[in-house]
Protein backbone atom coordinates (compact mmCIF):
# COMPACT_ATOMS: atom_id res chain seq x y z
CA UNK A 1 0.00 0.00 0.00
CA UNK A 2 0.98 3.63 -0.41
CA UNK A 3 1.18 5.79 2.72
CA UNK A 4 1.61 9.55 2.55
CA UNK A 5 2.74 11.74 5.41
CA UNK A 6 3.04 15.43 6.00
CA UNK A 7 6.14 16.12 8.11
CA UNK A 8 5.70 19.17 10.35
CA UNK A 9 3.32 18.56 13.26
CA UNK A 10 2.39 15.20 11.79
CA UNK A 11 5.62 13.23 12.17
CA UNK A 12 7.67 15.77 14.11
CA UNK A 13 6.68 18.13 16.93
CA UNK A 14 7.73 21.31 15.10
CA UNK A 15 5.32 23.84 16.63
CA UNK A 16 6.16 22.86 20.21
CA UNK A 17 9.87 22.99 19.37
CA UNK A 18 9.36 26.48 17.89
CA UNK A 19 7.32 27.47 20.95
CA UNK A 20 10.28 26.64 23.20
CA UNK A 21 12.60 28.61 20.90
CA UNK A 22 10.28 31.63 21.04
CA UNK A 23 10.29 31.49 24.84
CA UNK A 24 14.08 31.36 24.84
CA UNK A 25 14.63 34.09 22.23
CA UNK A 26 12.04 36.41 23.76
CA UNK A 27 13.15 35.63 27.32
CA UNK A 28 9.60 34.61 28.27
CA UNK A 29 8.05 31.74 30.15
CA UNK A 30 4.77 31.16 28.34
CA UNK A 31 3.48 27.81 29.57
CA UNK A 32 2.71 24.73 27.52
CA UNK A 33 -0.91 24.99 28.67
CA UNK A 34 -1.11 28.12 26.49
CA UNK A 35 0.49 26.25 23.59
CA UNK A 36 -1.96 23.35 23.90
CA UNK A 37 -4.93 25.72 23.86
CA UNK A 38 -3.95 27.52 20.63
CA UNK A 39 -6.62 27.19 17.94
CA UNK A 40 -4.33 28.30 15.12
CA UNK A 41 -1.29 26.75 13.48
CA UNK A 42 0.62 29.96 14.11
CA UNK A 43 2.03 30.40 17.61
CA UNK A 44 2.78 34.13 17.70
CA UNK A 45 -0.43 35.12 19.54
CA UNK A 46 0.76 33.27 22.64
CA UNK A 47 3.63 35.75 22.79
CA UNK A 48 1.53 38.87 22.19
CA UNK A 49 2.80 39.36 18.64
CA UNK A 50 0.93 40.55 15.58
CA UNK A 51 0.79 38.34 12.47
CA UNK A 52 3.53 40.44 10.89
CA UNK A 53 5.78 40.21 13.96
CA UNK A 54 5.10 36.48 14.23
CA UNK A 55 5.91 35.90 10.57
CA UNK A 56 9.16 37.85 10.94
CA UNK A 57 10.12 35.88 14.06
CA UNK A 58 9.32 32.52 12.42
CA UNK A 59 11.30 33.35 9.28
CA UNK A 60 14.28 34.65 11.26
CA UNK A 61 14.44 31.37 13.20
CA UNK A 62 13.62 29.01 10.34
CA UNK A 63 16.93 27.13 10.21
CA UNK A 64 16.95 26.77 13.98
CA UNK A 65 13.32 25.61 13.99
CA UNK A 66 13.82 23.10 11.18
CA UNK A 67 17.23 21.62 11.90
CA UNK A 68 18.13 21.68 15.56
CA UNK A 69 16.66 19.56 18.33
CA UNK A 70 13.10 19.15 17.06
CA UNK A 71 11.88 15.71 18.07
CA UNK A 72 9.89 13.22 16.06
CA UNK A 73 6.61 12.34 17.75
CA UNK A 74 6.95 9.17 19.85
CA UNK A 75 7.02 6.03 17.69
CA UNK A 76 6.82 7.94 14.39
CA UNK A 77 10.23 6.69 13.23
CA UNK A 78 9.63 3.12 14.39
CA UNK A 79 6.15 3.01 12.83
CA UNK A 80 7.39 4.16 9.43
CA UNK A 81 10.36 1.78 9.62
CA UNK A 82 7.89 -1.06 10.27
CA UNK A 83 5.72 -0.02 7.31
CA UNK A 84 8.81 -0.04 5.12
CA UNK A 85 9.84 -3.46 6.45
CA UNK A 86 6.37 -4.78 5.54
CA UNK A 87 6.89 -3.62 1.94
CA UNK A 88 4.65 -0.55 1.94
CA UNK A 89 5.61 2.60 0.02
CA UNK A 90 6.15 5.69 2.16
CA UNK A 91 5.74 9.16 0.67
CA UNK A 92 6.64 12.43 2.37
CA UNK A 93 4.67 15.40 1.09
CA UNK A 94 5.49 18.70 2.74
CA UNK A 95 4.83 22.37 2.14
CA UNK A 96 8.32 23.24 3.40
CA UNK A 97 9.91 25.75 1.02
CA UNK A 98 11.97 24.39 -1.89
CA UNK A 99 15.19 25.83 -0.48
CA UNK A 100 14.78 23.58 2.57
CA UNK A 101 13.90 20.37 0.72
CA UNK A 102 17.26 18.63 0.48
CA UNK A 103 18.34 19.57 3.99
CA UNK A 104 14.97 18.37 5.34
CA UNK A 105 15.42 15.04 3.57
CA UNK A 106 18.91 14.67 5.06
CA UNK A 107 17.61 15.58 8.52
CA UNK A 108 14.83 12.96 8.30
CA UNK A 109 17.32 10.28 7.28
CA UNK A 110 19.60 11.24 10.20
CA UNK A 111 16.62 10.85 12.56
CA UNK A 112 16.01 7.34 11.19
CA UNK A 113 13.01 7.90 8.93
CA UNK A 114 13.01 5.62 5.86
CA UNK A 115 13.31 8.04 2.93
CA UNK A 116 13.47 7.19 -0.77
CA UNK A 117 14.57 9.89 -3.19
CA UNK A 118 11.62 9.28 -5.53
CA UNK A 119 9.05 9.48 -2.71
CA UNK A 120 10.05 12.75 -1.07
CA UNK A 121 8.21 15.87 -2.24
CA UNK A 122 8.50 19.43 -0.95
CA UNK A 123 7.87 23.05 -1.80
CA UNK A 124 4.18 22.60 -2.59
CA UNK A 125 1.42 24.99 -1.72
CA UNK A 126 -1.64 23.36 -0.16
CA UNK A 127 -3.55 23.17 -3.46
CA UNK A 128 -0.60 21.54 -5.22
CA UNK A 129 -0.21 19.10 -2.36
CA UNK A 130 -3.86 18.04 -2.66
CA UNK A 131 -3.66 17.47 -6.43
CA UNK A 132 -0.42 15.57 -6.07
CA UNK A 133 -1.82 13.31 -3.33
CA UNK A 134 -4.67 12.35 -5.64
CA UNK A 135 -2.36 11.94 -8.63
CA UNK A 136 -0.07 9.38 -6.97
CA UNK A 137 -3.10 7.44 -5.67
CA UNK A 138 -2.16 7.10 -2.02
CA UNK A 139 -4.13 4.61 0.06
CA UNK A 140 -3.59 6.61 3.27
CA UNK A 141 -2.62 10.19 4.00
CA UNK A 142 -1.83 11.76 7.38
CA UNK A 143 -1.66 15.51 7.99
CA UNK A 144 -2.38 18.05 10.72
CA UNK A 145 -3.51 21.00 8.62
CA UNK A 146 -7.27 21.57 8.39
CA UNK A 147 -7.09 23.24 4.94
CA UNK A 148 -5.46 20.15 3.44
CA UNK A 149 -7.54 17.58 5.33
CA UNK A 150 -10.90 19.22 4.58
CA UNK A 151 -10.17 19.23 0.86
CA UNK A 152 -9.39 15.50 0.84
CA UNK A 153 -12.59 14.45 2.62
CA UNK A 154 -14.72 12.39 0.27
CA UNK A 155 -11.84 11.56 -2.07
CA UNK A 156 -10.84 7.92 -2.68
CA UNK A 157 -8.18 7.95 0.05
CA UNK A 158 -8.15 7.16 3.76
CA UNK A 159 -7.43 10.53 5.35
CA UNK A 160 -6.40 10.89 8.99
CA UNK A 161 -5.79 14.00 11.07
CA UNK A 162 -2.80 13.92 13.40
CA UNK A 163 -4.57 15.32 16.43
CA UNK A 164 -3.61 18.90 17.35
CA UNK A 165 -5.25 21.75 19.26
CA UNK A 166 -6.10 23.54 15.99
CA UNK A 167 -7.80 20.67 14.15
CA UNK A 168 -10.24 19.51 16.84
CA UNK A 169 -13.20 20.86 14.84
CA UNK A 170 -12.63 18.36 12.02
CA UNK A 171 -14.97 15.40 12.00
CA UNK A 172 -12.65 12.88 10.37
CA UNK A 173 -10.67 9.86 11.53
CA UNK A 174 -7.68 10.85 13.59
CA UNK A 175 -4.50 9.45 14.98
CA UNK A 176 -3.26 10.59 18.36
CA UNK A 177 -0.24 8.31 18.68
CA UNK A 178 1.77 6.57 15.98
CA UNK A 179 1.35 3.31 17.89
CA UNK A 180 -2.28 3.31 16.64
CA UNK A 181 -1.40 2.93 12.96
CA UNK A 182 -1.02 -0.85 13.02
CA UNK A 183 -4.55 -1.27 14.39
CA UNK A 184 -5.94 1.20 11.84
CA UNK A 185 -4.46 -0.81 8.98
CA UNK A 186 -5.75 -4.12 10.39
CA UNK A 187 -9.28 -2.72 10.69
CA UNK A 188 -9.28 -1.44 7.12
CA UNK A 189 -8.02 -4.68 5.58
From Swiss-Prot:
The keyword Hydrolase applies. Gene3D superfamilies: HAD superfamily/HAD-like. Its EC number is 3.1.3.-. Disulfide bonds: none annotated. It comes from the Bacteria. InterPro entries: 5'(3')-deoxyribonucleotidase, 5_3-deoxyribonucleotidase-like, HAD-like_sf, HAD_sf, Nucleotidase_putative. GO terms for molecular function: 5'-nucleotidase activity. One of its GO terms (biological process) is deoxyribonucleotide catabolic process. Keywords: Hydrolase. The keyword Cell inner membrane does not apply. Pfam families: NT5C. Belongs to the 5'(3')-deoxyribonucleotidase family. PANTHER family: NUCLEOTIDASE YQFW-RELATED (PTHR35134:SF2). This is Putative nucleotidase BC_3386.
Amino acid sequence: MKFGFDIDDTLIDLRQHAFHLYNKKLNKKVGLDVFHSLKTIEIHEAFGMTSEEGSHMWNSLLDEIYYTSCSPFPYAVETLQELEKQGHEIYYITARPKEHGEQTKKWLIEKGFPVHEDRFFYGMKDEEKIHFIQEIKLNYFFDDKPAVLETLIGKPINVYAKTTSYNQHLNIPRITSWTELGDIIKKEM
